[in-house]
């Protein structure tokens, strides 16, 4: 693959990861809002457990998808580095721009947000979030 074709592919992965975070945040906040607005969807109800199970399934598949895209991004970055290795100055300048985020950052943040959503659902289901 030509070096000129690799950079757009890397940028697509970058855009996908950025959009992926937005989708995760919106889905999590939507679940919290649904549970808060509709008492029939609280944890102790069948509907509430279905909503939370749906979020857990979504979050797991979302995380696995993000891991896959980051691995693709890393491979494409390595390929581009090999293609431009003959120009060390360019390789050094472009390194940060094409560097994929480390999975050691993505996984804990993702799981932390997932845990936050589940804790918020549990909290709302206990009635602690209601104003008396």
Model segments located where?
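Hydrophobic alpha-helical transmembrane segments
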Residues: 20-23, 91-117
């Amino acid at each position: 693959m030509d070096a000129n074709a690799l950079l757009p592919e890397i940028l697509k992965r970058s855009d996908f990861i950025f959009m992926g975070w937005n989708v995760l945040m919106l889905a999590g906040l939507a679940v919290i809002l649904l549970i808060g607005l509709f008492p029939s969807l609280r944890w102790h109800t069948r509907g509430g457990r279905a909503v939370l199970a749906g979020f857990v399934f979504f979050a797991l598949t979302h995380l696995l998808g993000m891991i896959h895209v980051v691995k693709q991004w890393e491979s494409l970055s390595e390929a581009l580095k090999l293609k431009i290795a003959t120009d060390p100055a360019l390789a050094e300048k472009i390194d940060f721009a094409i560097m994929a985020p480390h999975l050691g950052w993505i996984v804990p943040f993702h799981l932390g947000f997932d845990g936050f959503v589940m804790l918020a659902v549990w909290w709302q289901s206990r009635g602690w979030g209601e104003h008396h």
